[in-house]
C-alpha cells in the first residue's frame, strides 16, 4: 500500500553502480559511500541487461556489476545495520541457446526474469475462443525465442522466474 516508484537514471555502467548504492540507502561523501541507516528502496528493478559479455572481458556472474549486485543483495555485507535489497533484472534478449544469460542478470544473488508468450482468449461475441492478439494458440505459455536462457557461466540455473513478455 505504501509502494512508491523511485526512478534512477543510469546512462553508463558507473551510473548504474551509483544508482544502486543510492537506492540501497548509501550516501556518497567525499567519494566514500556510507550507509544512511535505511534503504530508499526495498526492490530495485532493472529492465535492461548486457548480452555481449566478451566486451567486458569477464564472464557474466563474475563481472563487476554482478558482484556489486550480489553484495547489495546480501544483508550486513557493507554495514552491520544494512538489511540488503532485492534486485531484479531482465534476463536479456540474447535469444535461445544454452547459456545466453548476460550481466548483471547472471548474478547468483539477483533475480532474473525471462519472457514467455501469452494468448489471452476472448470469451464473448464473434471472437469467442479466439486469441486476443491474433496469434495462434499453439505457442501459448512458451519461452519467447528472444529471451535469454541459462545456465549462467558459473552454473546457476537462470532465469529465476518467467513472466509474460510477448503475445
Question: Where do the protein language model's features map onto the residues?
Answer:
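Loop-rich non-cytosolic ectodomains and luminal regions
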Residues: 1-167
Amino acid at each position: 500500500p505504501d509502494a512508491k516508484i523511485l526512478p534512477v537514471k543510469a546512462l553508463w555502467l558507473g551510473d548504474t553502480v551509483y544508482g544502486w548504492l543510492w537506492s540501497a540507502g548509501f550516501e556518497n561523501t567525499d567519494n566514500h559511500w556510507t550507509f544512511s541507516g535505511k534503504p530508499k528502496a526495498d526492490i530495485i528493478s532493472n529492465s535492461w541487461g548486457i548480452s555481449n559479455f566478451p566486451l567486458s572481458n569477464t564472464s557474466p556472474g563474475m563481472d563487476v556489476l554482478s558482484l556489486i549486485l550480489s553484495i547489495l543483495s546480501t544483508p550486513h555485507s557493507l554495514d552491520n545495520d544494512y538489511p540488503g535489497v532485492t534486485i531484479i533484472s531482465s534476463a536479456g534478449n540474447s535469444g535461445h541457446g544454452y547459456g545466453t544469460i548476460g550481466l548483471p542478470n547472471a548474478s547468483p544473488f539477483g533475480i532474473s526474469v525471462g519472457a514467455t508468450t501469452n494468448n489471452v482468449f476472448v470469451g464473448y461475441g464473434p471472437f469467442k475462443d479466439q486469441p486476443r492478439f491474433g496469434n495462434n494458440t499453439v505457442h501459448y505459455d512458451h519461452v519467447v525465442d528472444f529471451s535469454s536462457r541459462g545456465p549462467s557461466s558459473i552454473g546457476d540455473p537462470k532465469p529465476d522466474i518467467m513472466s509474460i513478455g510477448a503475445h
